[in-house]
């Protein structure tokens, strides 16, 4: 769905909209459900955007009660609260992390945002090494060593240009990161200009310059691809961190070493010989 989903306690702050819920106006929002636990009333709100729900708009193997499950035909019955409404729902929640609607909404947002960072991070870890191995000169192509160049005698030339002197100061870099990223995240979480209510996970507008959300059916499919690749990227980044600690090499060099000598360069061989600090 390309609509805003939020679970809010009456008179409380909505975690997604970031604004006080003082009244419900049918012309602006649709009331999807009223429920609660332990005597607490809970409203589920969605901004009316004119887009149909995923289940109603497409016959997709990734959504609905007949969607693909985590173990295929051997998966068994999914929990009642996993209905296949959202992308990436394979009916698996042994820890019950999605049982509470508010916790589920928060975890959905965290997963998607971290997935996007992981996809960008994985690309940033791999691409410089690939370029360096193909003749492109870098001061330091290995991802976990590159940042330390700012403390070297010559400093760090951003984009290879010594004219960009702000890159020579770690404080200036930190300030730029806080201001720029803070502004973007604030825009996303607060709901855009003038407090307009938007979905913080899929805000659209200027965040969708290619118009990927214009077609609801195609957008539903893109969201599944995003979360699947994002989960893979998060596992990849975890692997890159472990490689950096154990081998002291980047992912491309580790891959090349493994392909050259798979018997001696593999996870089992390193795990059995690894001594912290050496």
UniProtKB/Swiss-Prot annotation:
Chlorophyll a 3 binds at residues 149, 159, 226. One of its GO terms (biological process) is photosynthesis, light harvesting. Chlorophyll b 2 binds at residues 116, 165, 194. Chlorophyll b 3 binds at residues 169, 185. Binds at least 14 chlorophylls (8 Chl-a and 6 Chl-b) and carotenoids such as lutein and neoxanthin. Chlorophyll b 5 binds at residues 177, 274. Chlorophyll a 5 binds at residues 225, 243. It comes from the Eukaryota. Chlorophyll b 4 binds at residues 177, 188. Signal peptide: none annotated. Keywords: Acetylation, Chlorophyll, Chloroplast, Chromophore, Magnesium, Membrane, Metal-binding, Phosphoprotein, Photosynthesis, Photosystem I, Photosystem II, Plastid, Thylakoid, Transit peptide, Transmembrane, Transmembrane helix. GO terms for cellular component: chloroplast thylakoid membrane; photosystem I; photosystem II. The LHC complex consists of chlorophyll a-b binding proteins. The N-terminus of the protein extends into the stroma where it is involved with adhesion of granal membranes and post-translational modifications; both are believed to mediate the distribution of excitation energy between photosystems I and II. This is Chlorophyll a-b binding protein 1A, chloroplastic. The lineage of its organism: Eukaryota, Viridiplantae, Streptophyta, Embryophyta, Tracheophyta.
């Amino acid at each position: 769905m390309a609509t805003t989903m939020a679970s809010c306690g009456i008179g409380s702050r909505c975690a997604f909209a970031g604004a006080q819920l003082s009244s419900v106006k049918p012309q602006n929002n649709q009331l999807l459900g009223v429920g609660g636990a332990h005597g607490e009333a809970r409203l589920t709100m969605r901004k009316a955007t004119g887009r149909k729900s995923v289940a109603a708009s497409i016959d997709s193997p990734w959504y609905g009660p007949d969607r693909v499950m985590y173990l295929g035909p051997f998966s068994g019955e999914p929990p009642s609260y996993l209905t296949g409404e959202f992308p990436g729902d394979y009916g698996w929640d042994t820890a019950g992390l999605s049982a509470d609607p508010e916790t589920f909404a928060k975890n959905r947002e965290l997963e998607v945002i971290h997935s996007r960072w992981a996809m960008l991070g994985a690309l940033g870890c791999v691409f410089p090494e690939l370029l360096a191995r193909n003749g492109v000169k870098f001061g330091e192509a290995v991802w976990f060593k590159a940042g330390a160049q700012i403390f070297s005698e010559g400093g760090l030339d951003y984009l290879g240009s010594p004219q960009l002197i702000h890159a020579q100061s770690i404080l200036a870099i930190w300030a730029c990161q806080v201001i720029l990223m803070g502004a973007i995240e604030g825009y996303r979480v607060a709901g855009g200009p003038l407090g307009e209510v938007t979905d913080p996970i899929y805000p659209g507008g200027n965040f969708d310059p290619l118009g990927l959300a214009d077609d609801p059916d195609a957008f539903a499919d893109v969201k599944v691809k995003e979360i699947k690749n994002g989960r893979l990227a998060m596992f990849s980044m975890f692997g890159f961190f472990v490689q950096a600690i154990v081998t002291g090499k980047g992912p491309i060099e580790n891959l090349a070493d493994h392909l050259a000598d798979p018997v001696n360069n593999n996870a089992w061989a390193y795990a059995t010989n690894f001594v912290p600090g050496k």
